[in-house]
Amino acid sequence: MTDKTSLSYKDAGVDIDAGNALVGRIKGVVKKTRRPEVMGGLGGFGALCALPQKYREPVLVSGTDGVGTKLRLAMDLKRHDTIGIDLVAMCVNDLVVQGAEPLFFLDYYATGKLDVDTASAVISGIAEGCLQSGCSLVGGETAEMPGMYHGEDYDVAGFCVGVVEKSEIIDGSKVSDGDVLIALGSSGPHSNGYSLVRKILEVSGCDPQTTELDGKPLADHLLAPTRIYVKSVLELIEKVDVHAIAHLTGGGFWENIPRVLPDNTQAVIDESSWQWPEVFNWLQTAGNVERHEMYRTFNCGVGMIIALPAPEVDKALALLNSNGENAWKIGIIKASDSEQRVVIE
């Protein structure tokens, strides 16, 4: 009888001990995100969360997203500590534009070979994003899949559930002629347009770690975490009659603003009302990118656009700016049957 080598899961490239070490490492940061409605802790087969009692007719709002190829840039530059904030931001910002308060978040982390330090940095960023948005990180999945990813490359995805009072859902139906548009400044490109960003870096031959822009490395501008607007917007909704909110993500101005406009309305954006942050000027120049393409691919310094009645504008601006946002009047809503839903002039 021939002796055969006894194989283990670890021999196949899956290290269960590393996975357990990761869980032990992140328990503390995850615990800090806990909301009173959450029942149980990490490790259950499913996460339990009650609905906050203040809602009379609660409606659940869900969203899922990733961070696109910003992740490739983060991996290339070995910066893993803020990509988790981006992941949460992409999900919770999509929820809050409908008036929803984020309740809980789950993440999916997949890699070819689990590096506990890298995964811990990413998940700590996710926990930080949850703290910024007031939602609980209730669980997730860490998948070590040898042969599916190159080396220690990884991918992340997020899923978030929020709640809104049925009578207070923001869906754009109240938008009308004469409404004013308020912009909320972005922290940079957020998590969109990074395939073009990487192409510009490649074609220009620029090293983002040694190239300086506004006194700091270009890499800092490109990897600045997506701004989370949840707490500022939720307070605004409580105190001001908000008609619509657009989150400027993939598709930029041209595709995201029309998503919240009723028929026979048009958003007119005043381009002179703000200056693009330098990173967008650099991208446009280095890539010779046309203006229309810039507004289709990037947020150009505007993370969200809020539509509200003209008499509410001063109150809204004061409230948003006092909460640390960079907010300004960016345009108006006009009655129009034009197929061009957004005009930038």
Swiss-Prot record:
Q: Which domain of life is it from?
A: Bacteria
UniProt GO BP: 'de novo' IMP biosynthetic process; adenine biosynthetic process
Q: Which GO terms describe its molecular function?
A: ATP binding; phosphoribosylamine-glycine ligase activity; phosphoribosylformylglycinamidine cyclo-ligase activity
Q: In which pathway does it act?
A: Purine metabolism; IMP biosynthesis via de novo pathway; 5-amino-1-(5-phospho-D-ribosyl)imidazole from N(2)-formyl-N(1)-(5-phospho-D-ribosyl)glycinamide: step 2/2
Q: Which Cys-Cys disulphide bridges does the record give?
A: none
Q: Where in the cell is it found?
A: Cytoplasm
Q: Which GO terms describe its cellular component?
A: cytosol
Q: Which UniProt keywords apply?
A: ATP-binding, Cytoplasm, Ligase, Nucleotide-binding, Purine biosynthesis
The EC number(s) attached to this protein equal: 6.3.3.1
Q: Name one Pfam family in it.
A: AIRS
> Do you know which CDD domains this protein is assigned to?
PurM
Q: Catalyses which reaction?
A: 2-formamido-N(1)-(5-O-phospho-beta-D-ribosyl)acetamidine + ATP = 5-amino-1-(5-phospho-beta-D-ribosyl)imidazole + ADP + phosphate + H(+)
Family statement drawn from the similarity comment of this UniProt entry:
Belongs to the AIR synthase family.
Protein name according to UniProt: Phosphoribosylformylglycinamidine cyclo-ligase
